From Swiss-Prot:
Function of the molecule: Hemolymph antibacterial protein.
Keywords for the protein's UniProt record, in alphabetical order: Antibiotic, Antimicrobial, Cleavage on pair of basic residues, Immunity, Innate immunity, Repeat, Secreted, Signal
Homology family: Belongs to the attacin/sarcotoxin-2 family.
Domain of life from the UniProt record: Eukaryota
Record note on modification: Attacin F appears to be derived by proteolytic digestion of attacin E.
GO cellular component, one term: extracellular region
InterPro entries given in the database record: Attacin_C, Attacin_N
UniProt GO BP: defense response to bacterium; innate immune response
Organism: Hyalophora cecropia
Coiled coil feature spans: none
Protein name: Attacin-E
Residue positions assigned to the propeptide: 20-47
Ribosomal protein in keyword set: no
Compartment(s): Secreted
Length: 235
């Protein structure tokens, strides 16, 4: 039943991508994509509190925590929170919410993000682990976001997206994602890879690299490279 619910969510959202925050830069609105830390991308549920730190090539950084507080032998409910810093080490976004993770790798989450100078956004997201064995893991993800700007004459608007993640032996991974915002008729795309550099039962260090681009009726970007490192820790 849980898997069917998540599957219906994926269909309704047209398959999703992970997107942290929306920034407004006059006169162009744009969506900034990011890679979730490993603790949120893991396809196998754990019952430990855990956190992650990320450092990116553009100078931005972030921290995220996930603390289980309820559940049974199949499903775990956790409180989640994160803080993102700009390349000038100022607050870029702060997020809080709840997540439901299933032992088979499926999941749901509901979060609220506050972006200084912009406003808030509410995001509902889901993931379905479509294949898993000792060597391969494939997960499809979806999200829908209601953006609520605190800016004069800018209405609330929606962003939806989708993506798929692949991992080989918990060592090498790849992902592809896309997002669409009707209000500005903008599409965002990203292709990413991950390499695990160090791993113990409670600690993981990963290298992430990829390319991203966007297009609107008025302008398009080229594929822009990005890379970073993440440290995940279970407690």
């Amino acid at each position: 039943m849980f898997g069917k619910i998540v599957f219906l969510l994926l269909v309704a959202l047209c398959a999703g991508v992970q997107s942290r925050y929306l920034i407004v830069s006059e006169p162009v609105y744009y969506i900034e994509h990011y890679e979730e830390p490993e603790l949120l991308a893991s396809s196998r549920v754990r019952r430990d509190a855990h956190g992650a730190l990320t450092l990116n090539s553009d100078g931005t950084s972030g921290a995220v925590v996930k603390v289980p507080f309820a559940g049974n032998d199949k499903n775990i409910v956790s409180a989640i929170g994160s803080v993102d810093l700009t390349d000038r080490q100022k607050l870029g976004a702060a997020t809080a919410g709840v997540a439901l993770d299933n032992i088979n790798g499926h999941g749901l989450s509901l979060t609220d993000t506050h972006i200084p100078g912009f406003g808030d956004k509410m995001t509902a997201a889901g993931k379905v682990n479509v294949f898993h064995n000792d060597n391969h893991d494939i997960t499809a993800k979806a999200f829908a976001t209601r953006n609520m700007p605190d800016i004069a004459n800018v209405p609330n608007f929606n962003t939806v997206g989708g993506g798929i993640d692949y991992m080989f032996k918990d060592k090498i991974g790849a992902s592809a994602s896309a997002a669409h915002t009707d209000f500005i008729n903008r599409n965002d795309y990203s292709l990413d890879g991950k390499l695990n550099l160090f791993k113990t039962p409670d600690t993981s260090i990963d290298f992430n690299a990829g390319f991203k681009k966007f297009d609107t009726p008025f302008m398009k970007s080229s594929w822009e490279p990005n890379f970073g490192f993440s440290l995940s820790k279970y407690f």
